A protein has these predicted regions:
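Small cysteine-rich, disulfide-bonded extracellular modules of the LU/uPAR three-finger superfamily
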Residues: 1-151, 157-174
Length: 174
């Protein structure tokens, strides 16, 4: 006679792999506030609208801020546009200038783009949803000659940027 002995049992293996994290993101956006005044300084209309910070503008900001190299600001200069544009992240200065730049104006008596002077930034708090902002002082553009329609504005800065109207140098920021 044969004798067989068997055993039985349960075996279980459980593995848990978890990766928890929080995403921290930063968006760059801006708003233009435009006021139109007549020759006597009376407000004719004002408008506020969002602007797009283009890819090359974001790259310039990150390259100068995070790389740690020395950098001095050239500009920023605020130009005006003479055509209705559909902003794209791929826009560069040659997208706008010279064909779409409105040039029938002076700033301080000279036919130049206005220099944007930004204040130190401020923040609404320390939570992830806070808003950090920096505002620029107002620039007065005096429309000359036959005038025309101003459709928008653009900000250019960086190496090669110039206050000279119709100049394509520099990096388009927005």
């Amino acid at each position: 006679m044969h004798k067989e002995i068997g055993s039985c049992g349960d075996s279980a293996v459980a593995t848990l792999q978890a990766s928890a994290g929080t995403n921290e993101t930063m968006g760059i956006e801006g708003y233009w506030h435009v006021e139109c005044r007549d020759a006597q300084g009376n407000l004719k209309w004002n408008e506020e609208f969002p602007n797009l910070v283009v890819a090359v503008g974001k790259q310039l900001m990150l390259d100068t801020l995070l790389k740690g190299s020395s950098y001095s600001v050239t500009g920023p200069y605020l130009g005006l546009t003479n055509a209705s544009l559909t902003p794209a992240a791929t826009d560069v200065m040659s997208t706008i200038v010279p064909s779409k730049e409105f040039t029938a104006y002076t700033v301080g008596g000279s036919a130049v783009r206005g220099t944007a002077v930004f204040a130190s930034s401020t923040s609404t708090g320390s939570t992830p949803s806070n808003v950090t902002s920096s505002t620029a002082t107002a620039i007065t553009y005096t429309i000359t000659g036959a005038g025309g329609t101003v459709y928008g504005c653009f900000l250019v800065l960086g190496s090669g940027a110039s206050s000279t109207q119709s100049n394509t140098g520099g990096t388009l920021y927005s």
